[in-house]
Amino acid sequence: MDTELLKTFLEVSRTRHFGRAAESLYLTQSAVSFRIRQLENQLGVNLFTRHRNNIRLTAAGEKLLPYAETLMSTWQAARKEVAHTSRHNEFSIGASASLWECMLNQWLGRLYQNQDAHTGLQFEARIAQRQSLVKQLHERQLDLLITTEAPKMDEFSSQLLGYFTLALYTSAPSKLKGDLNYLRLEWGPDFQQHEAGLIGADEVPILTTSSAELAQQQIAMLNGCTWLPVSWARKKGGLHTVVDSTTLSRPLYAIWLQNSDKNALIRDLLKINVLDEVY
């Protein structure tokens, strides 16, 4: 039996709501419904009664519940034990492409330069969207997440690493926002909430990407502008701030599981500055 089906069943039974279960599992509501139907088909019974928003366990669902909890608990314990033996020298760090390109690449270099303190440690630099990385962290498939948003789950520990400055850049001097096409570089959902006010409510991005390198290479060809970290843009050269734009300060957080068996290691690694300029 697919353990993901049992995991979904347990979440729906806990929340009594397909939408909230989908949010907790980082799935769509239709995916949650499909998984429950799959499990019901495998067992040949209905597990929930559905009357509008009132979702309840059937008698069969009530009987399955303790077995599902035991199976998932056993499975998680097995995964943890196997991971502990096979990954004791591995350490995975996840972040978006833009964060790796603009600042974390340099930090990774500093980690290797300080390897005397952690001899034999093997790093994995993982690139993905924040939502996917949060899920991996929750499932113990990732050791550390670096992101611009504070955690929203109680089981996570976090540390504010500092702040960095974003500015709107283009490839030629003395340009105004109205003269340029907008390239959206993803800096997190909370940044996008303010994006319309910073750019213009009617501005439709000509390109959306999670890669700062790609955005920087395209702005000249597309007569565009995009938000880039100031320290990174200065090192790149050939970039100019848009005249009628402002700057924006963004936080950077390290996030990990509170009960991670690598807590001490994580705190040691975070003693090495992640940002070149911390303020």
Curated annotation (Swiss-Prot):
The expression of the hdfR gene is negatively regulated by H-NS. Pfam families: HTH_1, LysR_substrate. InterPro entries: LTTR (IPR050176), LysR_subst-bd (IPR005119), Tscrpt_reg_HTH_HdfR (IPR020890), Tscrpt_reg_HTH_LysR (IPR000847), WH-like_DNA-bd_sf (IPR036388), WH_DNA-bd_sf (IPR036390). This is HTH-type transcriptional regulator HdfR. Belongs to the LysR transcriptional regulatory family. GO terms for biological process: negative regulation of DNA-templated transcription; regulation of DNA-templated transcription. It comes from the Bacteria. SUPFAM superfamilies: Periplasmic binding protein-like II (SSF53850), Winged helix' DNA-binding domain (SSF46785). The lineage of its organism: Bacteria, Pseudomonadati, Pseudomonadota, Gammaproteobacteria, Enterobacterales. It comes from Escherichia coli (strain K12).
